[in-house]
UniProtKB/Swiss-Prot annotation:
<dbReference type="InterPro" id="IPR005324">
    <property type="entry name" value="Ribosomal_uS5_C"/>
</dbReference>
<comment type="similarity">
    <text>Belongs to the universal ribosomal protein uS5 family.</text>
</comment>
<keyword id="KW-0694">RNA-binding</keyword>
<dbReference type="InterPro" id="IPR013810">
    <property type="entry name" value="Ribosomal_uS5_N"/>
</dbReference>
<dbReference type="InterPro" id="IPR018192">
    <property type="entry name" value="Ribosomal_uS5_N_CS"/>
</dbReference>
<comment type="function">
    <text>Located at the back of the 30S subunit body where it stabilizes the conformation of the head with respect to the body.</text>
</comment>
<keyword id="KW-0689">Ribosomal protein</keyword>
<dbReference type="InterPro" id="IPR000851">
    <property type="entry name" value="Ribosomal_uS5"/>
</dbReference>
<feature type="domain" description="S5 DRBM">
    <location>
        <begin position="13"/>
        <end position="76"/>
    </location>
</feature>
<dbReference type="InterPro" id="IPR005712">
    <property type="entry name" value="Ribosomal_uS5_bac-type"/>
</dbReference>
<dbReference type="InterPro" id="IPR014721">
    <property type="entry name" value="Ribsml_uS5_D2-typ_fold_subgr"/>
</dbReference>
<dbReference type="GO" id="GO:0015935">
    <property type="term" value="C:small ribosomal subunit"/>
</dbReference>
<dbReference type="InterPro" id="IPR020568">
    <property type="entry name" value="Ribosomal_Su5_D2-typ_SF"/>
</dbReference>
<dbReference type="Pfam" id="PF00333">
    <property type="entry name" value="Ribosomal_S5"/>
</dbReference>
<dbReference type="Pfam" id="PF03719">
    <property type="entry name" value="Ribosomal_S5_C"/>
</dbReference>
<dbReference type="GO" id="GO:0006412">
    <property type="term" value="P:translation"/>
</dbReference>
<keyword id="KW-0699">rRNA-binding</keyword>
């Protein structure tokens, strides 16, 4: 019964395994091998989180990454199935550029960025990654950019204008 509830709770999130690496710790007696997993989860409706887990076995590393990702969930304000406006983000040497796309465009993004867009619920976006292609840094840069995205309501409140005035300048 408890396993069934746990499985039901897990299924509410979309999960993407982005990378699995074999890592080594050199000690006096030789090398100790372990595995590191990078995972992105989301609900497909604007929530996304990432996690990084290390263990001696791959499944354990993935489970640790999933648990960490569930603790790091953030909410993204989407505009239907795309972004609110063009944004950039960076983390380390990774720089990401994203802009909304018209309906039917699809996800034009590569590598780790595509996994983030899949699980967050973005269906139409144009994105480019420059600098390092390190999956961990690209995911962090993408999520940093998405969380900094402002809704028209936030912009209107900040400027002391109505939402209609803000949206009239966009079109």
């Amino acid at each position: 019964m408890a396993q069934q509830k746990e499985h039901q709770q897990e299924s509410e999130f979309l999960e993407r395994l982005v990378a699995v690496n074999r890592v080594t710790k050199v000690v006096k007696g030789g090398r100790q091998f372990a595995f590191a997993a990078l995972v992105v989860i989301g609900d497909g409706k604007g929530k996304v989180g990432y996690g990084y887990g290390k263990a001696k076995e791959v499944p354990v590393a993935i489970q640790k990454a999933m648990d960490q990702a569930k603790k790091n969930l953030v909410t993204i304000a989407l505009n239907k199935d795309t972004l609110q406006h063009a944004i950039t983000g960076h983390h380390g040497a990774a720089r990401v550029f994203m802009q909304p796309a018209s309906e039917g465009t699809g996800i034009i993004a590569g590598g780790a960025m595509r996994a983030v867009f899949d699980v967050v619920g973005v269906k139409d976006v144009l994105a480019k990654c420059q600098g390092t292609r390190n999956p961990g840094n690209v995911i962090r840069a993408t999520i940093n950019a998405l969380t900094s995205m402002a809704t028209p309501e936030k912009v209107a409140a900040k400027r002391g204008k109505s939402v209609e005035e803000i949206l009239s300048h966009v079109q």
